[in-house]
Amino acid sequence: MRLLLLLLVAASAMVRSEASANLGGVPSKRLKMQYATGPLLKFQICVSUGYRRVFEEYMRVISQRYPDIRIEGENYLPQPIYRHIASFLSVFKLVLIGLIIVGKDPFAFFGMQAPSIWQWGQENKVYACMMVFFLSNMIENQCMSTGAFEITLNDVPVWSKLESGHLPSMQQLVQILDNEMKLNVHMDSIPHHRS
C-alpha cells in the first residue's frame, strides 16, 4: 500500500511539474521571429495536429518576402474542460498502470468483486499496461487537438481554419498579406484632420 501511495505521489508531482512547464501541450517558449519592427503576424496553431511544420514553412517564406513583419506562433489551446480531462487521464493512466504492476485490487477496497478485465490484466500485465497507456494517450490527444490554424495581422483576423475548414495555400496567404499591407500603407498615407 505504501508503494502504491508513493507511486501516486510521484505521478502527481510529475504531472504538476509537466503542467507548469508545458500547460496543456503549449510549447514553453513561443515561436518568434526576433528583430523585426513592422506589423505583427500571429499564428495560433494546433501543435498536436502536426501544423508546426506548416507554420515553419510559412514563416520562412513570409520572412523572406516581408522582412519587416514580426512573426509569432503559439499553440491554440482547447477548451478548459478538455484540458482538464486530458490532465486527469494522464494521472489516472499512471495510477492504473501502477496498480496493474503492483497487483493490488482496487475493487476490494470498495468491497466489490473484480471484473474479468481486471483479472485478465493481472494475468497479462505487459499487454494490459500497454493497452492502458496507448488508449489513454489516444483519448488525451483527441482532447488536446483543436484543428486550429488561426492567423491574425496586428490582432485583426485574416484567416481561420476553424471557420473555413482548410489551411490557406501559400498563394492565398501572400495575397491576403499583400492586400493588408497595401491597405495599411494607403491608410497611413491619408492625412488626419483635426476637427
From Swiss-Prot:
EC number(s) from the headed UniProt entry: 1.8.1.9
InterPro entries documented for this protein: Selenoprotein_Rdx-typ (IPR011893), Selenoprotein_T (IPR019389), Thioredoxin-like_sf (IPR036249)
Cited Gene3D superfamilies: Glutaredoxin
GO terms for MF: selenium binding; thioredoxin-disulfide reductase (NADPH) activity
Tissue: Ubiquitous. Highly expressed in the endocrine pancreas.
Organism domain of life: Eukaryota
Membrane topology recorded in Swiss-Prot or TrEMBL: Single-pass membrane protein
GO terms under biological process: cell redox homeostasis; cellular oxidant detoxification; glucose homeostasis; insulin secretion involved in cellular response to glucose stimulus; pancreas development; positive regulation of cytosolic calcium ion concentration; positive regulation of growth hormone secretion; response to glucose
UniProt crosslink position (Cysteinyl-selenocysteine (Cys-Sec)): C46-U49
Transmembrane keyword on record: yes
Enzyme category, top tier: oxidoreductase
Protein induction: Induced by Parkinson disease-inducing neurotoxins such as 1-methyl-4-phenyl-1,2,3,6-tetrahydropyridine (MPTP).
A Pfam family recorded for this sequence: Rdx
One cellular component term from this protein's GO annotations in UniProt: endoplasmic reticulum membrane
PANTHER family according to UniProt: SELENOPROTEIN T, THIOREDOXIN REDUCTASE-LIKE SELENOPROTEIN T
Noted disease: mRNA levels are increased more than 200-folds in the caudate putamen from Parkinson disease (PD) patients compared to control subjects. In conditional brain knockout mice, treatment with PD-inducing neurotoxins provoke rapid and severe parkinsonian-like motor defects.
Function: Selenoprotein with thioredoxin reductase-like oxidoreductase activity. Protects dopaminergic neurons against oxidative stress and cell death. Involved in ADCYAP1/PACAP-induced calcium mobilization and neuroendocrine secretion. Plays a role in fibroblast anchorage and redox regulation. In gastric smooth muscle, modulates the contraction processes through the regulation of calcium release and MYLK activation. In pancreatic islets, involved in the control of glucose homeostasis, contributes to prolonged ADCYAP1/PACAP-induced insulin secretion.
Protein name, as recorded: Thioredoxin reductase-like selenoprotein T
Source organism (scientific name): Homo sapiens
